[in-house]
Each structure stands twice: as structure tokens, then as C-alpha cells.
Amino acid sequence: MIFKFSQKALVALCLVVGLAEAVPSKSRVVSRASTFDYNGIVRGVNIGGWLVLEPWITPSIFDNAGDAAVDEWTLTATLGQDQAKAVLSQHWSTFITQGDFHRIAQAGMNHVRIPIGYWAVSSLPDEPYVDGQLEYLDNAISWARDAGLKVVIDLHGAPGSQNGFDNSGRKGPIAWQQGNTVSQTVDAFRALAERYLPQSDVVAAIEALNEPNIPGGVSEAGLRDYYDQIADVVRQINPDTSVFLSDGFLSTASWNGFKTGEDVVMDTHHYEMFDNYLISLDIHGHVKSACDFGKQIKGSDKPVVVGEWSGAVTDCTKYLNGKGVPTRYQGEYANNPKYGDCGDKTQGSVADLSDQERADTRRFIEAQLDAYEGKNGWLFWTWKTEGAPGWDMQDLLANGVFPSPLTDRQFPNQCA
């Protein structure tokens, strides 16, 4: 998480290209002894903000560290190794527990996607990060096994940052693909693969890298070469494991012909609050946009999972655009026009919203469920926050805004 730059033209182009290049949506990967058939439907949720921090998911951790702490790099640099290890260990041991995995399964999910940074397995000299995350990832694999869930392990942050977003560990310029950063990423991925891919009864897939930012400057040719190296690593360790490949903010159809039939799943993310056009839409426009996106991804010749999406339609959540960065919705960001007032949407629970806002949120969620299950399913972002209406699945479930059971519809046939 998260796509954070405006790309109205790119979104429109992707929709046009994706529909124009559409191929039958029931394309299949080579049949192998996988623990999950990704030609089927993924229904799951991300465990965001746990083993890779994001200021908007746990703002208290960053507020307590002072103004300089805007990502995990600056947080650990500000606190120092000892204090950072103490703060993060407390967070890792309490934010997510075994009970969360059982609640996810009880809600009808079959998958969790768990972000992890390279620094957890392959720390580099002179970097401030602390390790210790793998103990908790080990626990998560056991909890998923006990709950009957499949796991996608997601390499969420790479050396140098592959997207410049705070969720990569370090906000700022994109330096991935410079120097030795790609080989360092392969080393980190290999360490994760060697540790977890043998547990194929639970770890059904592993993601090569989260959100490499091609529009932001990542070389597409270099990314394809990196994906080739990652596929080789997986084949060497456990060829029954599927590999998730991010679309890099291109249309999924633009990857047609690349590794088709190799147990590869395209991962695409869809948010409607980081673009000036999309954030301006009313609920009817948001529903149509989600349904159109569902049609677009059918143009892929590989399985496609929408690996991140949300029930929110504004960027009002505290620190969503980054710590200290204002909102587009209220017209405070980069001289944007004002679209509305954030009101109760900055923090707290979806229960604090008006009846109409809750109904619209449910309607938007239902449209996305229908749209994404038209291909190969979805992974909601995210399971838990300190209070972010529209983003917090457990809060949405508790307040009847996320369907339970998942097939329940108050707004049926929106994408028909």
C-alpha cells in the first residue's frame, strides 16, 4: 500500500487498453500440485501495518516519536536501536494475534497477505532498521495453518525503495535499481523463500515485490529481469508455489505474454482517493469505476487478484498521504480544488459516519467484491488500524458495512 500519485490519464488509458486487448477471462495456469488453485477465487485481507509500519495505520507510534518520524527508517533512526526494538516488539506482539486469524477465517476469507520488509531478513550496513519480525511471521504461518487460511508472503519494501512511498520503509526518491539494490533484493527474497516456501500447505504464494513504481521511474525492462530472477528462485526452492507479480501501475493486460502459464498471478491495486478525478466522483461514479476496473482486468491472460483495495473514497484518514501531508478532499494538497469536508472520516470507526455514508460505503464494497470476483478475487487493505473509517475490515464487519456472509448483498447486480 499505497498508490499515491495522480494519474487520471494513465487510469483512463489503462481502461481503454485493457478493454481493447481483452482476452477470455478464464485463462489458466499450468496445473501443478499447488496448495491453492489461483484459477479460482481468492477472498482475503492484508495484515498491513504490522511487520511493516505505516503512519496512517498506527499513528500513535509515529506521534510518540516526534515530527521527524515519517516512515520506518526515520522512526528507527529517531528512536535508536534499543528503544526502537522495544517499541516495535511491543507492537508486533500485540497488534495482531492468533485470534485475528480465526476471526478472518470465520468471516469467510481463505487468504491473508502479509507484508514484510527486506530488512527483516537481510539487513544492510549503516541502516537504522531493527529486525525481529520473522519470529512473528513464523507465528502467523502457524496461526494461518490452524485457521485454515492460505498465506501470500509479500516483499513490501526493497533496498533504496521501489516506489518512494512510506510503506516501502523509506519515503522519498526511488533508488531501487541503483547500485547493488536489485541483487540485494534478490538475496532478501531468497532468504524468505528458503524459510517459508517449504511450508506449502499454508504458504500458497509469494509476492516478488510490492508496487514497484514504473510511472515514478522504475525501469520496466529492469523489473521484468528482476521478475525472471525471482521466478528462478521459486522454481529452485518449491516450484509448486505461485508467484504474485505487481503490475507496476500499468494495465494488467500490458503484461500479457510475460510468464503466461508459469504459476504466475498478477497483483493489481485499486484505490479511488489518490487521483483528482476519481476522488471527485459521487457514489454512482465510484461504483461505475470499480465495475469498469473489473472489466479491465479480464483482459489479462493470467489470473489477476486485486491485492489491495478499500471501502474509502476520500483521503481524509490521518496521515494517509503521509505524516504531515494534507488532504486532496479538503483542497489542501498541491492546490487541489476542494471536494468536501472530512468531518468524522479522519479517525475513529465507520460507526461514527452518517447512515448515508455507511450505506454508500457498503454499496462501494459490494460493487468491488462483484467486480473483482469476475476475475480471480481480492485481498482487502487492511484488517486492522487504530481507527480509519473505510479501511479497517474488522471495524467494517463489526458494524455491518462489510458483507457477512461475503455473498450477502444489499445492492445486488451493480456490475451487471
UniProtKB/Swiss-Prot annotation:
<keyword id="KW-0732">Signal</keyword>
<keyword id="KW-0964">Secreted</keyword>
<keyword id="KW-0326">Glycosidase</keyword>
<keyword id="KW-0378">Hydrolase</keyword>
<comment type="subunit">
    <text>Monomer.</text>
</comment>
<keyword id="KW-0624">Polysaccharide degradation</keyword>
<dbReference type="InterPro" id="IPR050386">
    <property type="entry name" value="Glycosyl_hydrolase_5"/>
</dbReference>
<dbReference type="InterPro" id="IPR001547">
    <property type="entry name" value="Glyco_hydro_5"/>
</dbReference>
<dbReference type="InterPro" id="IPR017853">
    <property type="entry name" value="Glycoside_hydrolase_SF"/>
</dbReference>
<dbReference type="GO" id="GO:0071555">
    <property type="term" value="P:cell wall organization"/>
</dbReference>
<feature type="disulfide bond">
    <location>
        <begin position="316"/>
        <end position="342"/>
    </location>
</feature>
<dbReference type="GO" id="GO:0046872">
    <property type="term" value="F:metal ion binding"/>
</dbReference>
<keyword id="KW-0479">Metal-binding</keyword>
<dbReference type="GO" id="GO:0009986">
    <property type="term" value="C:cell surface"/>
</dbReference>
<feature type="active site" description="Nucleophile">
    <location>
        <position position="308"/>
    </location>
</feature>
<protein>
    <recommendedName>
        <fullName>Probable glucan 1,3-beta-glucosidase A</fullName>
        <ecNumber>3.2.1.58</ecNumber>
    </recommendedName>
</protein>
<comment type="function">
    <text>Beta-glucanases participate in the metabolism of beta-glucan, the main structural component of the cell wall. It could also function biosynthetically as a transglycosylase.</text>
</comment>
<keyword id="KW-0119">Carbohydrate metabolism</keyword>
<feature type="disulfide bond">
    <location>
        <begin position="291"/>
        <end position="415"/>
    </location>
</feature>
<keyword id="KW-0961">Cell wall biogenesis/degradation</keyword>
<dbReference type="Pfam" id="PF00150">
    <property type="entry name" value="Cellulase"/>
</dbReference>
<keyword id="KW-0464">Manganese</keyword>
<feature type="active site" description="Proton donor">
    <location>
        <position position="211"/>
    </location>
</feature>
<dbReference type="GO" id="GO:0009251">
    <property type="term" value="P:glucan catabolic process"/>
</dbReference>
<feature type="signal peptide">
    <location>
        <begin position="1"/>
        <end position="22"/>
    </location>
</feature>
<comment type="similarity">
    <text>Belongs to the glycosyl hydrolase 5 (cellulase A) family.</text>
</comment>
<dbReference type="GO" id="GO:0004338">
    <property type="term" value="F:glucan exo-1,3-beta-glucosidase activity"/>
</dbReference>
<keyword id="KW-1015">Disulfide bond</keyword>
<dbReference type="GO" id="GO:0005576">
    <property type="term" value="C:extracellular region"/>
</dbReference>
